[in-house]
């Protein structure tokens, strides 16, 4: 589900350290069952298909005939591709780009920002802090709305549904990530 992937990227891009996005993750390339391993990936072979650049027959990756491909492509008619997603404001690729820009603009979310977990209850709530700022991150991948008490600040960014802060309580829709600072 694309909405869940967006929330997962919010989690990934709000963690300390250098985030790692493997090619195709940003467009939601899928695992393709039953591909022959050509590079010893075996269990990962289905996640190593060529990049899907566009919606052409060969996904913009090759001009070769299908029987000459070194690694098979995702043959699905609805396979995601970079060109289409770059044209859609609500696509996974567009959200990932916005999240990267948000991370770069906020020192607390960058590699050296500290992390502290608020509790071990659901939803996942943690604080990212730097000398310049503190951001509370709420990750709610579930379908139900949640409330989180004792959060100060205003909503800086949301992924998925909507969220509000009222009197120190965050109310967030299901399948939503919220950044409050």
Predicted regions, residues:
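Short amphipathic beta-strand/extended segments with alternating polar/hydrophobic composition
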Residues: 136-140, 149, 166-169
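Beta-strand-rich binding/interaction modules
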Residues: 144-161
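Loop/helix patches that line or flank the sugar-binding groove of alpha-linked glycan CAZymes
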Residues: 1-135, 141-145
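Ordered hydrophobic segments in well-structured contexts
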Residues: 123-125, 135-139, 157-158, 175-180
């Amino acid at each position: 589900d694309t909405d869940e992937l967006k929330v997962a990227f919010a989690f990934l891009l709000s963690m300390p350290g250098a985030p790692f996005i493997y090619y195709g993750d940003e467009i939601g390339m899928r695992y393709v069952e039953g591909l022959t391993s050509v590079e010893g990936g075996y269990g990962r072979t289905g996640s190593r298909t060529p990049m899907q650049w566009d919606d052409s027959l060969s996904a913009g990756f090759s001009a070769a005939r299908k029987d000459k491909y070194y690694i098979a492509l995702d043959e699905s008619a609805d396979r995601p591709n970079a060109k289409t997603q770059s044209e859609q404001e609500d696509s996974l690729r567009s959200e990932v780009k916005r999240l990267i820009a948000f991370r770069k603009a906020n020192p607390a979310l960058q590699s050296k920002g500290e992390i502290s977990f608020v509790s071990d209850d659901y939803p996942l709530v943690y604080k990212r802090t730097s000398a310049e700022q503190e951001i509370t991150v709420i990750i709610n991948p579930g379908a139900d709305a949640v409330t989180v008490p004792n959060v100060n600040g205003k909503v800086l960014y949301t992924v998925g549904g909507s969220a509000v802060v009222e009197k120190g309580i965050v109310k967030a829709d299901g399948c939503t990530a919220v950044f409050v600072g």
